[in-house]
């Protein structure tokens, strides 16, 4: 209790950078807490695990609908390992170089770099220009013909919306595979990764019903075209019929997994992610397509409202002029003073960057809090 009392709970959160304070329907925390689901058991024995297997199958189905892909796995630990595992899926004997956008989340870049080091592959970072992936730099890096896969984040770390379709065309023209790391809430209104030409779709699933809490537990979603199905890591639940002709669920393509291939398996994901996948499935079911789109629209509208208000203050400028979803960067002085003043007002301000602040707004932020934030920034800068 004493340690918990040291936690600071803000009434308004204007910080994102990979972890987002979205509305979570009340039902989301109750269903995963049922004793039928709350278990560390891995559902290897299908005849004893139909409920858990069905919940994972439904999660996979919803991820495929969200991304437009053909097949999804039962998730991995979080978004950064998902991107790294996707890079491993792209590897072949002749192409041992992976590219990742310099506008991707720094933690994702570092995680992919760690995985590449372990496999002896090389990671090269595509320079960013005006807050987005530089297409000319991408072409130059692809010219050598040694790139196996390219990872682009949409929206990127700075909140900017990449021209995902055009980048995909450049990548495929060079014979490389296209990994699109995307925000699942943004997919409520943006084109799907499949429509953008991606071969593999990954992302951080935390916005899908998982609360903020010291970085976890989260989940990383992964989906791919059927051509790459056998390279997906972790468990895949499939639907079939039993000896009586009744529908049932089983673990499919198990020869890929660690309990059979051991050290040759593509991952060692075990039971922990089933509960997070169930949480995401319940969230998506509760919100529905319309609810998810509404959350995305409100988040985008409130972020743009905040951006306009801040940009109208003398001394504050938007760092990038491109379109953004629900995050943006402002250049401004007195960062520490601004964030301290916001904290005094029970508002967690944006993430401090060099010379600026990365702001985020979700559907949970009331307009009054946005107006108050704008007023506080204006007051601090007027002194």
Predicted regions and their residues:
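Conserved C-terminal alpha-helix-loop-beta "cap" of PLP-dependent enzymes
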Residues: 290-373
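Short loop-beta-helix segment that forms the pyridoxal 5′-phosphate
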Residues: 44-48, 64-84
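Short acidic-aromatic active-site loops that bind/stabilize oxyanions
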Residues: 46-56, 76, 153, 157, ...
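Gly-rich Lys/Arg/Thr-decorated short loops/hinges at beta-loop-alpha junctions or inter-strand turns
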Residues: 35-46, 64-68, 94-95, 116-124, ...
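N-terminal entrance/gating region of PLP-dependent enzymes' catalytic architecture
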Residues: 1-58
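Conserved PLP-enzyme active-site core in the AAT-like
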Residues: 5, 81-246, 315, 332, ...
